[in-house]
């Protein structure tokens, strides 16, 4: 009985000491005291040592975390210093290599006009695919990288339409063009057409032209006032005599 009271007093002293230091008292201790789960000194020692071990482990973990973070910060600062030194000092440039003429993977956009040119109220999924295309440069500008072997490939995409506020999924087939082989070929430039000054005249002479001639017909009117005084004379004989006189 005296031993139990001694354990109880020692535990109360420990709790007061802990509360005096300012650390919060765990709720498990109050529960263990109320339940009388501490039956011996070994239980109390085990409990105290368990708390101390946990505290030691927590402190150890905190120290290791601090040291680890410090090591990371130090290594990061060293890396930054090395990068700064490399940026400030002249670096050795590697020799440039020509991008040779060969097939490369490119992204091809699947447009809606490849599926339906009469309707634009739909979506295509996927919106883009990968194709093989020739690319690269040649030794001079007179030759270009062009495909020498081409293969057509059929792929199936989804055509998404909205009908009565609901999506309708349909299947559509798209033809893709893949380049299998490439080669630098000579570019044949279109020759400019030169025209001489006489060529336009010859062209005009060869071209039949329709000429429209407009003639003006003048209508002669009798002079006014002539024979005006004889317009009421009906006798031709008298008229001749008068004119002959």
Curated annotation (Swiss-Prot):
Q: Where primarily located?
A: secreted
**Cellular compartment(s):** Secreted
Q: Could you tell me the keywords of this UniProt record?
A: Cleavage on pair of basic residues, Developmental protein, Disulfide bond, Glycoprotein, Growth factor, Mitogen, Proto-oncogene, Secreted, Signal
- Listed GO MF terms: growth factor activity; platelet-derived growth factor receptor binding; protein homodimerization activity; superoxide-generating NADPH oxidase activator activity
**Signal sequence extent:** 1-20
Specify the superkingdom.
Eukaryota
Q: Coiled coil: which residue ranges?
A: none
Tell me which Gene Ontology terms the entry assigns under biological process: angiogenesis; cell chemotaxis; cellular response to mycophenolic acid; embryonic placenta development; heart development; metanephric glomerular mesangial cell development; monocyte chemotaxis; negative regulation of gene expression
| Biased composition annotated in UniProt, kind: Basic residues | 220-235
Concerning SMART domains, the annotation shows: PDGF
Pfam families hit by this protein: PDGF (PF00341), PDGF_N (PF04692)
Q: Which pairs of positions does the record mark as disulfide bonds? A: 101-145, 134-182, 138-184
Q: Which InterPro entries match?
A: Cystine-knot_cytokine (IPR029034), PD_growth_factor_CS (IPR023581), PDGF/VEGF_dom (IPR000072), PDGF_N (IPR006782)
User: GO CC annotations?
Assistant: basolateral plasma membrane; cell surface; cytoplasm; extracellular space
Biased composition, Basic and acidic residues: where in the chain?
Answer: 236-245
Q: Which residues are removed as the propeptide when the protein matures?
A: 21-81, 195-245
Which residues are reported to be glycosylated? Answer: 63
Give the start-end ranges of region Disordered.
Answer: 220-245
How does this polypeptide assemble, per the annotation? Antiparallel homodimer; disulfide-linked. Antiparallel heterodimer with PDGFA; disulfide-linked. The PDGFB homodimer interacts with PDGFRA and PDGFRB homodimers, and with heterodimers formed by PDGFRA and PDGFRB. The heterodimer composed of PDGFA and PDGFB interacts with PDGFRB homodimers, and with heterodimers formed by PDGFRA and PDGFRB. Interacts with XLKD1. Interacts with LRP1. Interacts with SORL1 (via the N-terminal ectodomain). Interacts with CD82; this interaction inhibits PDGFB-mediated signaling pathway.
What is the stated purpose of this protein? Growth factor that plays an essential role in the regulation of embryonic development, cell proliferation, cell migration, survival and chemotaxis. Potent mitogen for cells of mesenchymal origin. Required for normal proliferation and recruitment of pericytes and vascular smooth muscle cells in the central nervous system, skin, lung, heart and placenta. Required for normal blood vessel development, and for normal development of kidney glomeruli. Plays an important role in wound healing. Signaling is modulated by the formation of heterodimers with PDGFA.
The similarity comment for this entry is: Belongs to the PDGF/VEGF growth factor family.
Q: Which PANTHER family match?
A: PLATELET-DERIVED GROWTH FACTOR (PTHR11633), PLATELET-DERIVED GROWTH FACTOR SUBUNIT B (PTHR11633:SF2)
Query: What is the designated name of this protein?
Result: Platelet-derived growth factor subunit B
Organism expressing this protein natively: Felis catus (Cat)
Lineage at the top is: Eukaryota, Metazoa, Chordata, Craniata, Vertebrata
């Amino acid at each position: 009985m005296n031993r139990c009271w001694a354990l109880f007093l020692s535990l109360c002293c420990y709790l007061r000491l802990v509360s005096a230091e300012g650390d919060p008292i765990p709720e498990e201790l109050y529960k263990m005291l109320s339940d009388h789960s501490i039956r011996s000194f070994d239980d109390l020692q085990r409990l105290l040592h368990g708390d101390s071990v946990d505290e030691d482990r927590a402190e150890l973990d905190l120290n290791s975390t601090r040291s680890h973070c410090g090591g990371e910060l130090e290594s990061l600062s060293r890396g930054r210093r090395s990068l700064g030194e490399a940026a400030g000092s002249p670096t050795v440039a590697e020799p440039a290599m020509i991008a040779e003429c060969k097939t490369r993977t490119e992204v091809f956009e699947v447009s809606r006009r490849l599926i339906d040119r009469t309707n634009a109220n739909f979506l295509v999924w996927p919106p883009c695919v990968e194709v093989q295309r020739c690319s690269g440069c040649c030794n001079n500008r007179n030759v270009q990288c062009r495909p020498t072997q081409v293969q057509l490939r059929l792929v199936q995409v989804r055509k998404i339409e909205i009908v009565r506020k609901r999506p309708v999924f349909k299947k559509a087939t798209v033809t893709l063009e893949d380049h299998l082989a490439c080669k630098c070929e000579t570019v044949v430039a279109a020759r400019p057409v030169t025209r001489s000054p006489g060529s336009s005249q010859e062209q005009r002479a060869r071209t039949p032209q329709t000429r429209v001639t407009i003639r003006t017909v003048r209508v002669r009117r009798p002079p006014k006032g002539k024979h005006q005084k004889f317009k009421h004379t009906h006798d031709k004989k008298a008229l001749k005599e008068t004119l002959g006189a």
